[in-house]
From Swiss-Prot:
Annotated organism of origin: Homo sapiens
Entry protein name: Coiled-coil domain-containing protein 152
Ranges in coiled-coil conformation: 61-246
Tissue expression pattern: Detected in stomach.
Keyword Iron-sulfur part of the UniProt annotation: no
Keyword Coiled coil on entry: yes
Protein keywords: Coiled coil
Length: 254
């Protein structure tokens, strides 16, 4: 019994060992397959990671593009809104322009009416000014005629004064000449009397002779001054008379 059991055990052990070897082979085969699959999975995982990175980069780029597009859309919306507002403003401006045109036409007509009124008033004032100018001219003519009469009388008066002064000047010159001749004769007579005296009195005659000469010279100077004053007065009157005649001629020309 022991041998049979021992043989049975050996048989069982042999069977279990073959099975174990077979199982190990299967396990090893599966492990190889699993390692191959793991390698493939690692490669696929690496590819997936690369693809994920690419997709993430694309996602970022797409998000940026979306943000850009969003901003563009927002800008377009604002542009559309602005254009709509402009359209409303244009409509309002058009209405305002029409109102301004109407007001301009009204003002233009009012301006034309005012111009016509001013032209009419200017014509009336022009006629009035012409009448006033004519009246002033007539008044000036009358004043000029009166001034001419007064000026003529003044000229005649000045001419008479000049004539009287000339006569006075001639009279004074004649009187001066007579006085000079008289003094000269007296001086000559006294000089002759003195010269007939003795030589002892010759020195005493020097003083009277010089005195007479100084008196004669002083008298001549005084008369010359009076004559110069009269001549200046006559010259001044003649100049005034000449100026008065020139102004009179100018007024007559005017």
């Amino acid at each position: 019994m022991d041998q049979s059991s021992e043989g049975c055990m050996k048989k069982i052990s042999s069977v279990n060992l073959d099975k174990l070897i077979n199982d190990f082979s299967q396990i090893e085969k599966k492990m190889v397959e699993t390692n191959g699959k793991n390698n493939i999975l690692d490669i696929q995982l690496e590819k997936s990671n690369c693809l994920l990175k690419v997709m993430q980069a694309k996602e970022v780029s797409i998000k940026e593009e979306c943000a850009t597009l969003h901003n563009i859309i927002k800008g377009l919306q604002q542009t559309i809104e602005y254009q709509q507002n402009l359209k409303g403003e244009n409509e309002q401006l058009k209405i305002s322009a029409d109102l301004i045109k109407e007001k301009l036409k009204s003002h233009e007509q009012e301006y034309k009416n005012n111009i016509a009124k001013l032209v009419s008033e200017m014509k009336i004032k022009e006629e009035g000014y012409k009448k006033e100018i004519s009246k002033l001219y007539q008044d000036m003519q009358r004043k000029v005629e009166l001034n001419e009469e007064k000026h003529k009388e003044l000229i005649e008066k000045k001419e008479m004064e000049i004539s009287e002064l000339n006569a006075k000047l001639r009279s004074q010159e004649k009187e001066k000449q007579n006085e000079i001749i008289k003094l000269q004769l007296e001086f000559d007579a006294k000089l002759a009397r003195v010269q007939t005296k003795s030589k002892s009195y010759q020195d005493s005659t020097v003083l009277p002779q010089s005195i007479y000469r100084r008196k004669l010279q002083h008298f001549q100077e005084e008369k010359n001054k009076e004559i110069a004053i009269l001549r200046n007065t006559i010259r001044d009157l003649e100049q005034r008379l000449s100026v008065g005649k020139d102004s009179h001629l100018k007024r007559r020309r005017f």
